Regions:
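Short histidine-centered beta-strand/loop micro-motifs
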Residues: 1-4, 45-47
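Ligand-binding loop in jelly-roll beta-barrel domains
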Residues: 29, 38-60
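Short beta-strand segments in beta-sandwich/barrel cores
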Residues: 15-20, 33, 42
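Short acidic-glycine-tyrosine-enriched beta hairpin
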Residues: 22-37
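Short, conserved beta-strand element in jelly-roll/cupin
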Residues: 2-19
């Protein structure tokens, strides 16, 4: 798991992603957006059969 010193915004351009933030798991698909405090421990995993593409914003 990782942490950053920023708020993070992730937009799923293509594919399916599983995002774990602390103990909570979110399943994201094309067109979904996730916004969270990057100081929380988090990780992501590609759960689709194809490559995933994510646009990430870090707000310091």
């Amino acid at each position: 798991m990782i942490q950053t010193d920023a708020f993070e915004c992730k937009y799923i351009i293509k594919g399916s992603i599983e995002y774990q933030i602390e103990k909570e798991i979110f399943t994201l698909h094309e067109g979904d957006t996730l916004f969270f405090d990057g100081r929380a421990r988090h990780r992501l995993k590609n759960i689709g059969a194809t490559e995933a593409l994510i646009l990430a914003f870090y707000l310091f």
